[in-house]
Amino acid sequence: MSFSEFYQRSINEPEQFWAEQARRIDWQTPFTQTLDHSNPPFARWFCEGRTNLCHNAIDRWLEKQPEALALIAVSSETEEERTFTFRQLHDEVNAVASMLRSLGVQRGDRVLVYMPMIAEAHITLLACARIGAIHSVVFGGFASHSVAARIDDAKPVLIVSADAGARGGKIIPYKKLLDDAISQAQHQPRHVLLVDRGLAKMARVSGRDVDFASLRHQHIGARVPVAWLESNETSCILYTSGTTGKPKGVQRDVGGYAVALATSMDTIFGGKAGGVFFCASDIGWVVGHSYIVYAPLLAGMATIVYEGLPTWPDCGVWWKIVEKYQVSRMFSAPTAIRVLKKFPTAEIRKHDLSSLEVLYLAGEPLDEPTASWVSNTLDVPVSDNYWQTESGWPIMAIARGLDDRPTRLGSPGVPMYGYNVQLLNEVTGEPCGVNEKGMLVVEGPLPPGCIQTIWGDDDRFVETYWSLFSRPVYATFDWGIRDADGYHFILGRTDDVINVAGHRLGTREIEESISSHPGVAEVAVVGVKDALKGQVAVAFVIPKESDSLEDRDVAHSQEKAIMALVDSQIGNFGRPAHVWFVSQLPKTRSGKMLRRTIQAICEGRDPGDLTTIDDPASLDQIRQAMEE
């Protein structure tokens, strides 16, 4: 079957299509109804079927490949490496599941996980899935008030954390941040389970705090039966990044999530049992939830949990892992690759990367220069894909297991099965034609694996995502265009649009032009208020060579060259009013550019919540660059 036929069946016959895909996982009780869409926009998949994510990730592989690698935990910060076979991982997950039950955790209870990227974090999530507890991971290093807001929203009976993590040689004091958060929160967990890594001193609260290692010792060898959950019970809550006010918890189911991930591993990522999948993300983000914690194990692959930066202690650290563990598929973000662009390619190429078959990139738009550079450097195809926290798995990609169409630089590909993607005119709501820019939306029902609702707030779910147009369609809040061959191109968020004297430009368009300059390593473009034009674009550039930072004449020359390049590629209406050179740009710890923060600084406004920022010194660079 061609991909086109596969896709059309998913849109025209969704119930039959997804019933067939559901055979990819084990069901303890068969479902009686594939889809219940009687209360749109809410969709219920595989109704009355009973299954379990942990069983499908671990237990069902025990007979086929018990001694195959399942989990590889690597920390470039502590220089530790730990490996677990499926049998060993099964033992560890059972022990932790027994620990959770001893602390009073029951089916449907929330367990908040605030941990570094260590094996215990992954094992804890699988243990929650095993007993039917709902896990909610808060990205490590979030400031206390952000953690407190999530505690109050999720109301966990237990929090699992650690003394500290590390990033680029810097210690991140998880326990201290957590204690501050709990003191600010109205809801109080019954217990806090703590992994002591010996990285930082931590005060313990008597009667509340429990040592992970000591409790584990009491539960070694325990066997905890799987809780068979109805498909639409909640598996996890994941809070979207960058929210203000009340946190927005994306609620996901059990059966739909398992089926969607299992299908994607075969059709999109080409994962095969016995292989090794390296997703260089964090379990606190959706990519890590889906393609570190669950999807590789569902496919019988080993999954790598990595603590550290792509450049620490050197720029070869990822590639050493690829070589050592014979990684066949790797998943990262464009930002990480742009960082690596600043280093000599010889440092990467000196490693044996012959096992690596493809590199997947997602999380933000992938510019063509970065895609070309990494593909040539690694000598592997690069496959972009586009999705969101809410979708849980790719909305657009090239389904490499089904589709032989080539990748097209700058495009994440075509809509994936189950996603009836449309581009709509923002004013009229009418469908856009070829090469016409519109908002990317998805016709309901959303396919399995996507957001069920916002935790505890159905009204907000409908109002936020389904009320933008006159008819109910799911709004992604991303601009896109579609070419004559059906490839889509993401132009940035709908709030990342610059209106310069009536010309509407996506920041992505200008950034892509500037990125094509040979002296540019990375760039961020924002729109700032202008008395004459309404808005003008300004660019902050990380140069490949430091002379643009040290010599004003060189910087001025480079600025003129970049402006001329934008003139030639977009037109002078897209030319930045200023190009400033910096050595780093403000980003979250997950690598996302903080464009709104940059914009606020440029306009002299309060930059607001900075809890997700990786290095606050980058903000000083923005301010200093503008003053010079």
Give the residues covered by each predicted segment.
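AMP-binding/adenylate-forming catalytic domain of the ANL superfamily
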Residues: 190, 194-196, 535, 568-593, ...
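Structural core segment of the AMP-binding/adenylate-forming
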Residues: 126, 130-214, 326, 333-334
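Conserved ANL (AMP-binding/adenylate-forming) active-site segment centered on the GW(Y/F)…HTG consensus within
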Residues: 379, 448-477, 494-495, 507, ...
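Gly/Ser/Thr-rich phosphate-binding loop
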Residues: 298-301, 328-332, 341-407, 420, ...
